[in-house]
Amino acid sequence: MVKWDGEFSPVYSTISSTPEYKPTLLGEIPSLGKDEAIKALDSACNAFDKGKGLWPTMKVVDRINAMENFVEEMKQKRDVVVKLLMWEIGKNHTDSQKEFDRTVDYIYDTIEAYKKIDRDSAKFQKHSGINAHIRRGPLGVVLCLGPYNYPLNETFCLLIPALIMGNTVIFKPAKHGVLLISPLMEAFKKHFPPGVVNILFGRGRVLATPIMESGKVNVLALIGHSTSANSLQESHPKKNRLRLVLGLEAKNPAIILPDADLDLSLIHI
């Protein structure tokens, strides 16, 4: 971790704890800028080292051990992460607990899926008279941007698979739900080699744009709005080489009953 001596931005709760409904200060985060974003990018690139770095060349069993050790330490931070999740984005306590537990389960499921991929890759596959030995490898530097409504679960759905496959990651938490990452930073530092996990705090447009403009990002992993995805793609100078993992606006169906107020229903939908 790098010590920050610059400006900080306050983080307020969506829930007021005063009779006057004044904002409740929960903490503060560093206001990082373009220079810090490029340093994080260089750190990720150096750690990957064109696929020759310590993490991408590490044995599968060792990467799995690192991830298992990380999640075990993460589980010890359950109470504080749940409270920060609840206070910052206004999610109730039960749902906050469910999000944490679901995230832990997802990490274990990802580990098991990776074990299966590794076992299957040891076998030869035959198709049309051709025998092939196929192995999956890391892609490079991944920029991960998660949503505010599930700032832990959906963000880790991008982050964890990228890491366990041997990629290096630049990760910017969502604008809301940012403090819950703080209790986990020591675990990231402890269980992953330097430069593998790079966490940036600040405004997405300020940080993500110069990173994408560098052309050094191999994968954009984003859950959010299509406008953001399109803008980031356009800023990458090598679009044909950029891989995308996107979860954008949903098209969920809605059922409106005959006795409903149509105008009111449309507002809430």
What spans do the regions from the language model cover?
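Terminal low-complexity tails and localization/encapsulation signals of metabolic enzymes
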Residues: 1-29, 62-69, 101, 116-145, ...
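Rossmann-like NAD(P) dinucleotide-binding subdomain of oxidoreductase/dehydrogenase enzymes
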Residues: 119-264
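Conserved small/polar residues in nucleotide/adenosyl-binding loops
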Residues: 267-269
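Active-site/binding-pocket entry motifs
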Residues: 17, 113, 261-262
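Short, charged helix-to-loop "capping" segments that act as catalytic/coupling loops
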Residues: 13-24, 45-60, 193, 213-215, ...
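A broad structural signal for alpha-helix termini and local helix breaks/kinks
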Residues: 2-3, 89, 192
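Glycine-rich loop-to-alpha-helix module at the N-terminal edge of alpha/beta enzyme cores
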Residues: 20-117
